[in-house]
Amino acid sequence: IIARAVAANVGAVITAGVTVEDSRKAIEAARAHERVFAGVGVHPTDLAGPLTDGDTADLDQLAGVPEVVVMSEIGIDHQDRSPDRQWQNQAFQAQTEIARKHGLPLVFHIREQGDDYDAHSARDAALSLLREASAGDLGGTAHYFQGRWKHASQFLDLGFHISFAKTLLRIPDLEETARKTPADRILLETDAYPQPFKKNRDKWTEPRDIPGVAAKLAAVRGVGIDEIRRLTTENALSMLGSKATVVRALVEPDRIE
């Protein structure tokens, strides 16, 4: 995966944790590969109950590791079979506090029931929690964004970035959001989670797919792809804040995921 990313001119990859144990594996991957950096966190759909004191202590310890550059992946998920919403709110709050302690930007997941682009319960819950924690000053991004412009603008108003993935290639409603998002707030990603539902392993989403998203974004915004490469690299480094130092030393100006 890393070799294919390098061949596609992706300069660096952030691999996210979705459980405490998975976060440890993300750190191991970052230590093993110089182009890989880690995020730590518990994903809302991986909750089996409220975060325990042990969970938060473990995440606190992991968040202080030098290879960790973001609190990820945390969030709110309101699908029918998602875990209890109170558990999710508690986990989101606890992980935001850990992020603040360690100066980590937030990479957060928001998913509505039935992937309804006009639904808003998950978004409203996330916005409320972010405002309550004054989390905008931490920086971060609404990751794998799939909402309408009116929804994106609410996260932008708090100071967050908007991250576009391969869904931009297949969801026309996202194009308005991609056009209107300020140039200094756009990020690119692939959200390369395991995809066993795809029978052909070669079709799994990977960091190597970033150039395709960049090309689509360039077409939607009416600019050249070199401009998209430049601004999204600058934006990623800006989003990382103080954690950008270790990435900046590696990444060339036109390459980053």
Predicted regions and their residues:
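Mid-domain alpha/beta scaffold segments of enzyme catalytic cores
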Residues: 1-257
